[in-house]
Amino acid sequence: METLSYNIVIRAPKQKIWDILWAPETYTKWTQYFSEEPTIIKSDWKVGGRTLFVDHNNNGMVATISNLDEPNEVTFNHLGIVENGEDDIESEKIKQWSGAPERYSLILLDDGSVKLHVEIQIDPEYREVMDRGFTNGLQTIKKLAEEKEFPV
């Protein structure tokens, strides 16, 4: 497993950035760079609860939230994959990376801007996908957050 981190400074309030990260109408905009299929997030937003990152065919990832401090930080721990709506959290391949964290932190800087810091643990074979996804995705979050007309 490899730990990757990504950062971007955004001139917007933390809550606005948080909402852009996780609101259904904006989540698909910044995550479009990770795969060809649009991905949605379905979560009960509870520590120990269930979170799905899936496409329209119900294929994707299943995770749980291990830390939630809105609008400052959330940590997802990936548990397995979802294929055709069925969870796989038991296979040997899954057990190699099950529990891998994905953390989003919003840090207020001295000048009033906010640093969005993402840290994710992945299998090295997915590094290129993550680099492309987060590099482009964080730019999209910044653009949306710094637009005046986006509701807070």
Task: Cite the ranges covered by each PLM segment.
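Short, charged/polar surface micro-motifs in flexible loops or helix N-caps
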Residues: N57-N59, N67-V74, G80-N84
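Short amphipathic
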Residues: T3-I10
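Beta-strand/loop substructures that line and gate deep hydrophobic ligand-binding cavities in soluble
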Residues: N77-H78, E83-T135, V152
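Short, mixed charged/polar active-site loops
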Residues: T3, G60, G99-P101
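Short amphipathic alpha-helical signal-transduction/dimerization elements
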Residues: L138-E149
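A short, structured loop/turn motif at beta-sheet edges
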Residues: R11-Q15, S66-E73, S105-K115, K143
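Amphipathic alpha-helical segments
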Residues: R11-T31
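Short beta-edge strand/loop motif at the mouth of beta-sheet-based domains
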Residues: S5, E25-V62, E73, V152
